[in-house]
């Protein structure tokens, strides 16, 4: 599944002329690498995938990711310095942070910001993923049922004694 998603992102790279795709969002990082955490994911034109992670996340990133280089970096803005070393040519990103985008635009004025390719790649679901989604939905439904039994309509929160 991850290979198929990566192929879709590479097709996006080809059609838009992006040399590098960068993800800051944990869910997009997960679908690209298999690692969910505080890190930056990079997909290069040649298909190489790199994770830039803070020191506390590096070990887990190495354990949980698939076919990725993992680079240690400081957190926050200083991670952009590490990121900029990897970026060449036209860059596409899902970055939602205004100050980070401003910093990236200084080095890469033609940077393209779009979450569309990540959404498109996440539309694909296999049987395993569908089973996990069903299991998660059931857990949420069960939790809602427990909360509904504990709380009563018309009672104040302080009197409902949920926990």
Protein language model regions, located:
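Short, polar loop motifs at secondary-structure junctions
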Residues: 26, 53-60, 95-101
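Compact, glycine/acidic-enriched structural inserts
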Residues: 52-79
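Hydrophobic beta-strand segments of well-ordered beta-sheets in folded domains
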Residues: 47-51, 68-69, 88-92
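Generic hydrophobic/packing signal
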Residues: 16, 20, 40, 60-62, ...
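Short, well-ordered alpha-helix to beta-strand connector turns
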Residues: 18, 67-68, 88, 108
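Terminal domain-start leader segments
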Residues: 1-51, 85, 106, 145
